[in-house]
């Protein structure tokens, strides 16, 4: 084969092929088929470019004889055949002068007429299989692919063959001649069978042995091996094909694929009705903390001790009274419950030794608030099989609620910085590999951006409350245990701080199944007057319990202190996820990492430092009615974290449904923005599925409103 190559190809091509093989550490004495393939590919690239010029008027012309007077520019820039460094220099230069998008892999040519890079393929197999492998490897709409085979077939992106028929015929004839010459020397069969598919990163992880046999056995009919199936799936063109398949399925199935244009989508319809109300398990932006700095009291770290110490820092207690009643509740019971907490805390202080936990007396007000004896008696199903009118409870449809401005304010507040540090920089030991060094550097930069964030405070508060409540639910099943709502942080100066937000009283908690509910009453301090946004506090009874002196620009001012009381409930599975809220930090860090990776792959070096250090650069954060909002990288980190935290705090079936269904519409819109000419069927059904999830949940309604802003600006 080596002798044939040296006889059959131009010496310049042979020399370039030798260099290329040397660069990749391949021995042409052994890899003779590869040597022949490289020479063939080089020759096709040169023939593609030969005789094609652009004249002074910018028109593409074919000139077969050199005319020394003609001021002509080569139509194609040849990249194939250069050493890697030089080839990338040429590519970068083309991108800088023409504004073309930089390809991830080295292409073969650049077409100055069509302003696009071209990837040339020469295959001994079927052209469509090889085309799909190329497309799967390149994954770029911008690079044009043109495949030739030794049998005279060809395939190109969007059937755009770039060259005139005569130029292409010349290439096909040359390939056919090479094939015949090889066949006459008995070399063709070996050459034909030696072609391997395009190597992509994923395919280098070879599946072998039993797993390989299982993969090959598990293929759909008509596929001989995993590679063919992979190539088919990766290059699958759905439009048209789906339509045909559906029509074969059933006479009733009728799906006409409609083109999805800029004018096609309409905004998502948000429900009308009274404004939505707060439904989180604890107060967010409205919470007030009673704090102690540098705690060193006896029993420090025991929640009840810490809570009593924090309560002692406030001196403005007064006779409590209801300022905003709960419409459906017995408000005097909420008032009596708070008075009972104060009285029982006072009793503890009068004891010689403070106990580690406090179980509340089972008073009538607490029994009512915690739903004691309210659950209907359970009857074994076998005992009532014969009851003729056995049926489920009639339950009312939930009332539709409209979006209210308070949830956007809550989100904005969650993105802000506080004056405390809520998470420590984890020390995980020395890095032993370069990748560990990059990973810990990214983690440290990210931690620095979010450690002061209010969303991080919500994480630590959520972790503490859920852990304490789950522990108490298991350890004191029959007791009405008093659980302080506590968090710990550091001041800017590094001093430790313990904060008390209020109290929870837990009801009976015989939790056998993950979804069994434990009721609790929450009592939380706040300076927010509930009468300003009464719709937000529909589920709460709010008491005024004291006056707090605050420092302001005009000196000390007195502000009323409120207590937000409500009955609530949670389950083992919800508490388990609440305890794991730190995962939100990981999720948002991974999103930032993918942004850094994208930037690093373009620049071909790790961009972590530049990413966080370049304070002048702004990044897109989200959509608002004003347009695309931008901010610093720190703001992006905090916004992504806040979104993740709110997904946890406001988790619900409505959110699950909206996220899954709206994502489908988002993907279609993204495809339209990428000029992929998407098609859809039953778009009305998709809108129905999305809008079915918009009932009364504030976080879902806000996300739907953001989605509408995105639609408006994405389709301009």
Swiss-Prot record:
Membrane-spanning intervals of the chain: none
Stated family: Belongs to the influenza viruses PA family.
Protein name: Polymerase acidic protein
One annotated Gene Ontology cellular component of this protein: host cell nucleus
Listed cofactors: Mn(2+)
Chain span(s) of sequence motif Nuclear localization signal 2 (NLS2): 184-247
Keyword terms: Cap snatching, Endonuclease, Eukaryotic host gene expression shutoff by virus, Eukaryotic host transcription shutoff by virus, Host cytoplasm, Host gene expression shutoff by virus, Host nucleus, Host-virus interaction, Hydrolase, Inhibition of host RNA polymerase II by virus, Manganese, Metal-binding, Nuclease, Phosphoprotein
Organism: Influenza A virus (strain A/Ann Arbor/6/1960 H2N2)
Gene: PA
Compartments (UniProt record): Host cytoplasm; Host nucleus
Binding, Mn(2+) 2: 80, 108
EC number: 3.1.-.-
GO molecular function: endonuclease activity; metal ion binding; RNA binding
Motif Nuclear localization signal 1 (NLS1) per UniProt: ranges: 124-139
Residues where Mn(2+) 1 binds: 41, 108, 119-120
Oligomer and partners: Influenza RNA polymerase is composed of three subunits: PB1, PB2 and PA. Interacts (via C-terminus) with PB1 (via N-terminus).
PTM (free text): Phosphorylated on serines and threonines by host kinases, including human casein kinase II.
Cofactor note: Binds 2 manganese ions per subunit.
HAMAP family linked to this entry: INFV_PA
Source organism, top-level taxon: Viruses
Summary of the function given for this chain in its UniProt record: Plays an essential role in viral RNA transcription and replication by forming the heterotrimeric polymerase complex together with PB1 and PB2 subunits. The complex transcribes viral mRNAs by using a unique mechanism called cap-snatching. It consists in the hijacking and cleavage of host capped pre-mRNAs. These short capped RNAs are then used as primers for viral mRNAs. The PB2 subunit is responsible for the binding of the 5' cap of cellular pre-mRNAs which are subsequently cleaved after 10-13 nucleotides by the PA subunit that carries the endonuclease activity.
GO BP, one annotated term: DNA-templated transcription
